Amino acid sequence: MLTGALGAGVIALLLIFLTRGPPAPAAEAAASAPFAGGAAAGGGPPPDISNMSPRERFDRLYNRIMTAAENGDEGTVTNFSPMALQAYTMLDTVDADARYHAALIKLHTGDIDGATALGDTILANSPGHLFGYIVLGTVARFRKDDAGLKKAYSGFLSHYDAEMKAGRTEYTDHARSITDFKKAAEAERSPA
């Protein structure tokens, strides 16, 4: 019961944040943020996330966090990560893509064990899924675990062709991450 109340509280805070207007100096910057739904997203008021599905809420928060991380905005990453992870727990169904998103958020917030568990779960539920190897390889690189990184690279490369032929939508959505990890894996495999 406490978890439900906590979740409702997080969502309520998120609704308040999204529906109230930003301070005047930040209005222009906020309008161009991918989560804000301002002018850059087609104009008009911020989106009413109460009408969004749990997956849409989670994806919007994930996108905002990743954009902030790419721009070095640790404050946004820190502020929105708990909301995104709470939204993740509210998903009706959890697929490899959602687990991958949650794992990346956990990596950005220092929850390495949580990210590892999600990477393992991706591979347990979808053997050979490239996201599992990307998560586990990223964790291994962070931990300076050369054997773990080599294992992740090897698994990734051994499943790459078959997985790409599967035509998974999430692979198209994360093509850059897959390409970057593949290049790193091939560079590791090739003699210098």
Regions from the language model: what does each represent?
Residues 151-192:
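Terminal, low-structured helical/coil segments at or just beyond the last alpha-helical repeat
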Residues 37, 62-63, 67-69, 102-106, ...:
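Alpha-helical solenoid repeat scaffolds
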Residues 66-126, 135, 151, 158-161, ...:
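Alpha-helical adaptor scaffolds
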